[in-house]
Amino acid sequence: MAMSVNVSSSSSSGIINSRFGVSLEPKVSQIGSLRLLDRVHVAPVSLNLSGKRSSSVKPLNAEPKTKDSMIPLAATMVAEIAEEVEVVEIEDFEELAKKLENASPLEIMDKALEKYGNDIAIAFSGAEDVALIEYAHLTGRPFRVFSLDTGRLNPETYRFFDAVEKHYGIRIEYMFPDSVEVQGLVRSKGLFSFYEDGHQECCRVRKVRPLRRALKGLKAWITGQRKDQSPGTRSEIPVVQVDPVFEGLDGGVGSLVKWNPVANVEGNDVWNFLRTMDVPVNTLHAAGYISIGCEPCTKAVLPGQHEREGRWWWEDAKAKECGLHKGNVKENSDDAKVNGESKSAVADIFKSENLVTLSRQGIENLMKLENRKEPWIVVLYAPWCPFCQAMEASYDELADKLAGSGIKVAKFRADGDQKEFAKQELQLGSFPTILVFPKNSSRPIKYPSEKRDVESLTSFLNLVR
């Protein structure tokens, strides 16, 4: 059971607001490494044990107190201490997530802002998660927005930040990476080390650690995660949860709550909402960008491709997370499948009757043939990979289209215990990898594009077969 403990004093900010008219409208502030999120503080109420305050507990003896009579004084002390005992509220967020499972994003957003006030903020990446800001605006409640400026964002994203601030009349609170850490990384490995040894180290310096500092000043945060963004890693995101990775203002495990108002919303519905509400959007979207991150690690995707294919495209599908939402990555999915531990757990893909299924021996024999009578096109795939799943329809269509043409269309499952073989012998870099074995040639040619529609694959075949 996921629970969060919220400790509140009997002297609450709500009481002060209603009785004395003190405005609790949140202050927009810089939440850099030198200053955390501004908070409204309520002066602590000190205990008065002098006996001069009137006690709510009547003395046991109505006669005047004497020097030797300590019972009334003890009763007074107990009563006054009792007045200041803090109330501990235990929230079951698993149960709350169930109650809100079918709620609208607006209802979830309103609940989050109502519950946490100035202690919650929206994490804004500069993409379609601007929908979160629109939902917060529609609640009529004050809200805060922060963003991670990695120093490597697209110029279009910076201009978009400015447009959002002007549209909503807000100030986005930017978090920056530690300059010493960035200098150390760049001087030791260069500006583009992530192309060589993966993006995790760079993301840790430029994104994860700045985020950790920002969240230390909050009790909750709001993200734009959706289940359909990455079926392999985000398919079980709840609408609200105790953050399994980061700590909040009070410190310790369970001190931060994570809200995901659009977890159950599909990407198309988000865009319909943005168009209907005439919300400003990042101009990169019009250029084919869907998932937007840092400039060196983001590119446009083509029709039919999954949106996350535009991020860290040189890495395996299972690596397409930067670490900000590590707690939502399914721990037992990809790793087990890659190691061949759960082959039967995922249904196979590419099921056209005109498609040849190759075994390890079959593809080894195909590689040995130096004078093939017909060309082959083979996809190296893993059925759990969302990018392989995304091209299933087009590849099956290709097999049906080429049936009887003299071109063989085949598949080879290259995960699990076949992965190392595929890396060494078949040029496997990430899933899916497509190879063409030309006629009268033993060396396969790797398809270089991520455009996997029927027309593009057919055109490539005609050029190299």
Swiss-Prot record:
Activity regulation (record text): Stimulated by sodium sulfate > ammonium sulfate and is sensitive to inactivation by 5'AMP.
Organism: Arabidopsis thaliana
Enzyme class: oxidoreductase
EC nos: 1.8.4.9
pH dependence: Optimum pH is 8.5.
GO cellular component labels: chloroplast; chloroplast stroma; plastid
Transit peptide (residue range): 1-53
Disulfide bonds: C385-C388
Domain topic, free-text comment: The C-terminal domain may function as glutaredoxin and mediates the interaction of the enzyme with glutathione (GSH). Active in GSH-dependent reduction of hydroxyethyldisulfide, cystine, dehydroascorbate, insulin disulfides and ribonucleotide reductase.
Main location: plastid
Region Reductase domain: start-end pairs: 73-327
Family according to the record: Belongs to the APS reductase family.
Record keyword Ribonucleoprotein present: no
Tissue: Leaves, roots and stem.
Keyword hit for Cell membrane: no
Catalytic activity: glutathione disulfide + sulfite + AMP + 2 H(+) = adenosine 5'-phosphosulfate + 2 glutathione
Entry keywords, A to Z: 4Fe-4S, Amino-acid biosynthesis, Chloroplast, Cysteine biosynthesis, Disulfide bond, Iron, Iron-sulfur, Metal-binding, Oxidoreductase, Plastid, Redox-active center, Stress response, Transit peptide
Official protein name in the record: 5'-adenylylsulfate reductase 1, chloroplastic
Active site: C385, C388
Matching PANTHER family: 5'-ADENYLYLSULFATE REDUCTASE 1, CHLOROPLASTIC (PTHR46482:SF9), 5'-ADENYLYLSULFATE REDUCTASE 3, CHLOROPLASTIC (PTHR46482)
Domain Thioredoxin, chain residue ranges per copy: 344-465
